[in-house]
C-alpha cells in the first residue's frame, strides 16, 4: 500500500503544478481528422467561425491548435462546429451525410463510431519512395484557390512525368488524377489552357499531392498518412497496444491462440503434451491472471478459460487491444497482469462477404465465412462462422506413440445484430455457439473399445458453449459527452472429458450485467464514470478415477459491486485516472479495488505512464490445470479440497501490480522509428500455489510467504528501407514463489526471450513476413526421486523458432489473396514431451513437463476472398 500512497501523492503534486501553469492559458490542441489542403482550409475556417481567435491545423500530425477566450466560447462549441463542417474530432463525429458530401480528395479514413479518433495513431511514411523496384501509382488533386481562399477542383488538367511526355493523364471532374510512377523520374508537369505550364517536384510517392493554382501559379501541398498494422496510442491514458487485422494477416491466425505470433507482448504456450489446449502468458504469469474480454464483455472465463482461445476465429477479429498491468475499474476486478480485449467485425461497417480456407501438411483444415448485410439505415445483421478439422492421428514428431494433437472438429459461430436510430440510441445483440469434440492419446487408441480401460491410453473432451449478449447505449443529443450504457451476457459451458482412467466433467452457468454512466464536469478537463455490476456463476464439477474415487463439487458465486472513475485531462499532454470499486462476494465478503494511471507527454515524441492497482480472482484449480488428470500424479489432500468450504477451502487470489512505461518516437534513416521500455512488478498478497515439485504428486495450497514477478521489456520499431518494417524486442523475467520446499523460480518459464519481426509489403500486392523467436532455458520441476530412466535435467535447453509467410493480392480491388507459409522452420521440437510414455498407466507417467515446441516444421497455404 505504501507505493500506492506515494503514487497518489505524486499525482497530486503533478496535478497542482500543471493546473497552476495553465491557469492563464486558453490554448488547446486536439485531434481532427482530415486529408489535404482543402481540409485544412475547411477545419480552420470552422474553428474561427465558432469563436476561436486563431486556429492552425497540421496536415502532418492531424492536430489543430486553437487559441480562444474560455469566458466567451467553450472548446466543445469549437469542436462541434468542426464536426458540422465534416471532420471527425477526438470527441465529435461528423454527420455521415456531411462527410459523404466532401470532395473526393477529402475522404479521410474514418474510425468506427464506438472508438475515439484520438485512439488512432496516424503515422507518417517519410521515405521518399523513389527507389522502388515495383510499379507505384501516384494520386493527387488540382484545385484553384480564389482570393477569398476558397478551393475548387479543376478538371481537364494534363499531367505527365517530365522526361516522358507520351504518358499523359487528365484530372477528372473532381480534380483528381492518378498516374503510374516511372523509376528515376521526380517531376510532374501540369498543363491547362487557362493556366501557365508548371513543374512540381514529387517528394514522396506515398503521399497524396494537392496542387493549388493561384494567380496561374502552381504549387504543391503534401498530405498523406497511413495507419500501422500495430501501434500504441500516445493520447490514451492507459497504454494499449492495438493489433489491427493487417497485423493478423501476417500469419495464418486460424484462431485467437495463433494471433500473437508476430507480437512480443504475449506468449502463447501449450498447456501440456496431449490435450492441444493453449494458454497465454503476460508479464511471466499464466493466462488466468489476465482478463480476456470480447468487445468489453467477459470472454471465455472460469471453466472455459483453458480452451477459450480456440473459440474465437482469427478472421472474425477486427483488432486486438493489449493492455499490460491493471485496467479500468469499469471492466471489473479480476485483471491482475493485463487485459486482452478482442474487437470483432461488426455488421454495420464490415465487408458483405469474407471467405477464408486454410490447410497445412499436418492434416488440419479451416473454413471461415463472414457475412454482413445492412437491412436499412437503422438495422444491420452479421454472421460469422468457423469450422476446424483435424484427422491426422499419426502425427507424432517425438516418436513416443502418442498423437501430438487430438483429432476431431471444432465449430463456432456468431449471429449478431446492430441497431442505430440516429437519435442517440445504439444497440448490439446476438448469440454465440461453440462445439469442440476431440480425441487424443496413443495412436492405436479406439474410443469404442479402449475408453477408460488399460487396453490403450486415450483422452477425449467434448466442450459446448452457448452465449447470448446485448449492449445498449444512449448518447444524449444535447451533450455528446453524456451517455449511459448497459452490457448484458449469459452463457452456459459444458465439458465432458476423460484422461486414461480419469474422468472430469464440469458445467458453468454465468450471468453478467454492467451499467455505466459517464459525463463531464464543466468541461472535458474533468470526466467521470460511475456504474454498478453483477456477476453470477454456478459451478458443477465431477471428477472420478476408475475403481478409486468419485467426487461431486458444487458452488454458487455471486459478486455485486459499484465503481467510480475520475479522469483529469487539463491538456492533451497529461491525464490522471483514479478509480475505485467496492464489491461483495457471497463466499469471501467485501473487498475494495483501487487503481490509478498517470500519463505525461512532455513533447509529441515522448510519453510516460505510471499505473498501479489491485486485482482479485477465485481460482478454479481443476479446470485451470487439466493436465493433472493426464498424468499419474496423485492430488494431495484431495478429499479436503473437494469437501472444503467456499472454493476448495482456498482463499481468493489477490495481487498488486505497478508499472512504468516510456515510449519514444524519433526519425532514423529519414523514416519513423520508436523505442519503448516497460517495467512491471506484480506482488501477490495471496496466491493459490500449484506445486509440481514432487514428481509423484501435485499440491494446491494458499501462499505462505512471497510470490512476485518482475518484467522488463524493450522494443525497437523502425523502417530500414522503404516498405520494410522491423520490430525487435528483448524481455527479462524474474518470477519466483515460496513453495513448501523453498523459494523457487516459476517452472517452465523462460527468463530471457528475444524477438524479431520483419514485414515487407509492396503496392503490387506482394507481402513478405518473417518472425524470429529466441527462447531461453526454463527451470523444470524436480524429478530427482524418480528412477534414473524417468529423471529430467534441472533446466531445459534454449531454442530458436522461425516463422515466415508470403502473400499476394489479386484483382482490381485487391480482394483475392493467396498465402503460403511455414512455422517452426528451424524444426526444433522437444524430444521427450511425455515422461514415462512407455508405461502410461504406471506411477511416473506425466504430460505436464512440456517446455518447448511439441511439433516440428509445418507448412500451410490458404486463400482469402472478400467483397467490399
Task: Give the role of each language-model region.
Residues 155-162, 191-194, 205-249, 287:
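Short, acidic, small-residue-rich periplasmic hinge/interaction motif at the N-terminus
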Residues 177-180, 279, 297-324, 413:
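Short acidic/polar hinge/loop motifs at secondary-structure boundaries
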Residues 205-211, 256-259, 278-281, 307-313, ...:
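N-terminal periplasmic accessory domains that precede
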Residues 257-301:
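Extracytoplasmic beta-strand/coil segments of soluble accessory domains associated
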Residues 390-412, 418-484, 490-508:
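Flexible loop and strand-edge segments within Gram-negative outer membrane beta-barrel domains
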Residues 485-497, 601, 609, 648-702, ...:
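Membrane-embedded beta-barrel scaffold of Gram-negative outer-membrane proteins
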Residues 616, 685, 774-783, 808-868:
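C-terminal beta-signal and adjacent terminal beta-strands/loops
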Residues 678-684, 702-783:
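Gram-negative outer-membrane beta-barrel transporters
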